[in-house]
Design a protein with these regions (language model features):
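Non-catalytic cap/lid and distal C-terminal segments of serine-dependent acyl enzymes
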Residues: 1-272
Length: 272
């Protein structure tokens, strides 16, 4: 596998930014065999949480080792604490993730597949909410969405935030992102994640498959239950929604385990 750190200028963000890229490579190293798809690489867009940056998945998990035998390309962007939304008082991170970055990467990496069925978007915590936000707003671009320990989504913060001991910090972040410190007041608006789940199912016939995993001791567990209920109340399960839970709090032990389980569902076998 090739590991790349890419610095470039984003027109949408109007500033320089960074991504980490794991590139498939047919190779045999000590303790690791790599695989490369013959024609094009399937892509995992892997999103970080609120306190992290583009390097976090590479530093806290063995994502390169997990992707190697699958011939899977992994792209890890950086979006500060934006929740992957076009911020009211900040950069347009949604436009960057959903449009600008894929176009840039397609030019830089010609073997990167642009097929919907070959593009997966996943993340932890804020990144799980971001995967849902970006994926559900673009069901024609992503075949699968993976949410791990999703918590930072409107209008569900009241279910856990007061237990976190960081209420002031989240209020300030919300002002930058939404233009209001009270994200619960956004129920029924364009930012309402439950409304987005329902509206996307009504408006589109082709939908991404949803993989959702949550730790049973995670303080954000009640948020996961509301999201789960919303998906399961849609007749016919058009998202093919799949929910899993297991022991764990809001930590990397859980995310490292469950990103592997998600990759197993992709049934990728790599190239020859």
């Amino acid at each position: 596998m090739a590991l790349l750190h890419v610095n470039f200028h984003s027109k949408v963000l109007n500033m320089d930014t960074k991504i980490g890229v794991i590139m498939p490579q047919k190779m045999q190293g000590i303790g690791l065999a790599g695989s490369e798809q013959a024609d094009s690489f399937p892509v995992l867009w892997l999103l970080h949480g609120r306190s992290d940056d583009y390097t976090i998945w590479m530093r806290r998990t063995s994502i390169e080792r997990y992707a190697a035998p699958l011939g899977l390309m992994v792209i890890m962007p950086e979006v500060s604490y934006s929740r992957y939304i076009n911020m009211k008082h900040g950069p347009r991170y949604y436009d960057y993730i959903s449009k600008d970055l894929p176009e840039f990467c397609a030019k830089l990496f010609p073997k990167m597949s642009r097929k919907r069925e070959d593009n997966y978007i996943a993340g932890l915590s804020m990144g799980g909410g971001g995967a849902m936000w970006v994926g559900l707003n673009n069901p024609d671009k992503y075949g699968r969405i993976c949410m791990l320990s999703t918590g930072g989504v409107a209008p569900l913060e009241h279910l856990w935030r007061n237990k976190s001991g960081s209420d002031y910090m989240f209020k300030k972040c919300n002002e930058d992102i939404y233009g209001t410190s009270d994200s619960d007041s956004l129920a029924g608006t364009e930012y309402d994640i439950l409304k987005l789940i329902q509206d996307t199912a009504k408006e589109h016939t082709v939908l991404p498959k949803i993989y959702h995993a949550m730790g049973t001791e995670d303080v954000r567990y009640p948020v996961a239950m509301e999201i789960k209920k919303t998906f399961e109340n849609i007749p016919g399960n058009p998202y093919e929604y799949e929910y899993h839970e297991g022991p764990g709090v809001h930590e990397w032990v859980f995310w490292d385990e469950w990103i592997q389980h998600f990759l197993d569902t992709l049934a990728l076998k790599g190239g020859n």
